[in-house]
A protein has these predicted regions:
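Mixed-charge, Lys/Arg-rich low-complexity intrinsically disordered regions
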Residues: 1-10
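Short beta-strand-centered aromatic/proline hotspots
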Residues: 24-35
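SH3/SH3-like beta-barrel fold
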Residues: 40-44
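Intrinsically disordered, low-complexity, charged/polar segments
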Residues: 46-95
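Short acidic DE-rich linear segments
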Residues: 94-103
Length: 103
């Protein structure tokens, strides 16, 4: 799977995976919306519903092209959870410092 950087990477039937924080979704590319060329149409791989996604949203760094790769998705989720753990550790440190300063 590679980051979607250019709309030209999309070919009919190709897989596109959305990954953001702890959310992910897998789509199959269909075509440009017939009435609005600022939207692209996809089939949701799990529900089989047609989904329309705005072009600029596709290029924001949260979409990847290629066959669905469970290992890749799980590594991205691990990165997210590591960031969350660091954030919570920093909050704990800040709270402890404030408590020390009060005493």
């Amino acid at each position: 799977m590679e980051l979607l950087k250019d709309i030209g990477q999309l070919t009919k039937g190709c897989g596109v995976t959305f990954i953001k924080n702890d959310k992910f979704h897998y789509y199959e590319y269909l075509m440009v919306h017939p009435n609005r060329d600022t939207y692209y149409l996809f089939i949701d791989n799990w529900s089989q519903e047609v989904v329309r996604i705005y072009v600029s949203e596709l290029l924001n760094g949260d979409y990847y092209v290629g066959d669905f790769d469970t290992v890749f998705v799980n590594k991205k989720m691990i990165e997210f959870y590591k960031r969350m753990i660091r954030c919570h550790e920093n909050r704990i440190k800040e709270s402890l410092k404030r408590n020390e300063n009060k005493q």
